């Protein structure tokens, strides 16, 4: 199923959803958005935050072309060979059977992000030889390995060539339930969710923001309600996903760095690009949860551990840890993504992503064997 730019204007429905979301806890609080500066329209930027109660054990990886992959779904796993190289942020890659790709960008400028969605329900059909399985832990990587644009990825995903599978979160009585966002160098965007066992794709350049619960169609309803109020009058300010969605949506549409930096419009493309990067970082920080903040009765409201920003046109991947004084970045143009005989490269970020890097960090990656995706 695919939904394209459907506007929902029912205020009554929106008010009901506001009441519903105020009464529910968020399982995992992350935010993702695509910033499209109307004064710099050919320069899209994607930013995301990772909020989690414990150390996500995140590292950065360089994956080359022609890397053989298995989808982590047991006997009938989807198998493929990567067409494009990528730089990604992992989670739990030090734990056998737990690793995943949570965020990243490939050499063509396609970005992928997975965020928590408690309402996710994946197909109950078991993988077979004719229709193999793909673990949610490998979902983002599959897209980065195989596609150059959002449109190309969406057209392939619509064919449903695989069955998406999940497993219980280690030490918890719940399944890993995620949804996927995609964005590219044209500013195109897509949100892919599994609701009631069926794939739902929201594909439009207008779908710039994604958080967690509720489902994306309901987030659009909430946003329509707040649009009527107007962000200059009042914006919801809690750490809940619905509130972060509204705040991020307001700012990505209303910020104007040209007003803040004198003469930026006349200083040329480089200065405009710098201003847009600063804007993206400021918005994602606004949607972040302060480090060390938690609620005793709501353990799933968690601190922001790290943030990433993707410069799709310059092919730069920025990383900011909550416990490091520096932002650093990886310039994909400086990386040789040619096949490496099955090997990859890893940038060890240390416990709680506390290892300090500065500036362009591609030279600090060390050869490493790719991790295996968490699976059945």
UniProtKB/Swiss-Prot annotation:
Q: How is it used?
A: PaPVA exhibits high recombinant protein yield, better pH and thermo-stability, and greater specific activity for penicillin V than other PVAs from Gram-positive bacteria, actinomycetes, fungi and yeast, suggesting that it could be a potential candidate for industrial production of 6-APA, a chemical compound used as an intermediate in the synthesis of beta-lactam antibiotics.
Into which family does the record put it? Answer: Belongs to the peptidase C59 family.
In terms of pH, how does activity behave? Optimum pH is 5. Shows a narrow pH spectrum (4-6) of activity and is most active in the acidic pH range.
**Which is a GO BP term held by this UniProt record?**
response to antibiotic
Q: Which organism is it from?
A: Pectobacterium atrosepticum (strain SCRI 1043 / ATCC BAA-672) (Erwinia carotovora subsp. atroseptica)
Taxonomic placement: Bacteria, Pseudomonadati, Pseudomonadota, Gammaproteobacteria, Enterobacterales
Location(s), subcellular: Periplasm
Listed under catalytic activity are: a penicillin + H2O = 6-aminopenicillanate + a carboxylate
- Gene of this entry: pva
What does the UniProt function comment say about this protein?
Answer: Catalyzes the hydrolysis of penicillin V to 6-aminopenicillanate (6-APA). Shows high specificity towards penicillin V. Can use other beta-lactam substrates, including penicillin G, ampicillin, cephalexin, cloxacillin and dicloxacillin, but at a rate less than 10% of that of penicillin V. Does not show any activity with glyco- or tauro-conjugated bile salts.
Assembly, per entry: Homotetramer. Dimer of dimers.
Phenotype when changing residue 48 to H: Retains 6% of wild-type activity
Q: Where does the UniProt annotation place the signal sequence?
A: 1-29
Q: Indicate the residues that form the catalytic site.
A: 30 (nucleophile)
Task: Specify the protein name.
Answer: Penicillin V acylase
Q: Name one GO cellular component term.
A: periplasmic space
Mutation: residue 51 to N; reported impact is: Retains 5.1% of wild-type activity
Q: Which GO terms describe its molecular function?
A: hydrolase activity
Temperature-related activity data read:
Optimum temperature is 45 degrees Celsius. Retains 87% of its original activity at 30 degrees Celsius and 50% of its activity at 50 degrees Celsius after 2 hours. Shows significant loss of activity only at 80 degrees Celsius.
For this protein, the activity regulation entry reads: Exhibits uncharacteristic kinetic behavior, showing positive cooperativity coupled with substrate inhibition. Penicillin acylase activity is enhanced in the presence of the reducing agent DTT, indicating active sulfhydryl group in the enzyme. Also shows enhanced activity in presence of organic solvents and detergents. Inhibited largely in presence of Ag(+), Hg(2+) and Cd(2+) ions, which have strong affinities for sulfhydryl groups. Activity is also inhibited by bile salts.
Q: Which UniProt keywords apply?
A: Allosteric enzyme, Antibiotic resistance, Hydrolase, Periplasm, Signal
Q: Does the keyword Hydrolase apply?
A: yes
**InterPro entries registered for this protein in UniProt:** CBAH/NAAA_C, Ntn_hydrolases_N, Peptidase_C59
Q: Tell me any Pfam family this protein matches.
A: CBAH
Task: Give the EC number(s) listed in the UniProt record.
Answer: 3.5.1.11
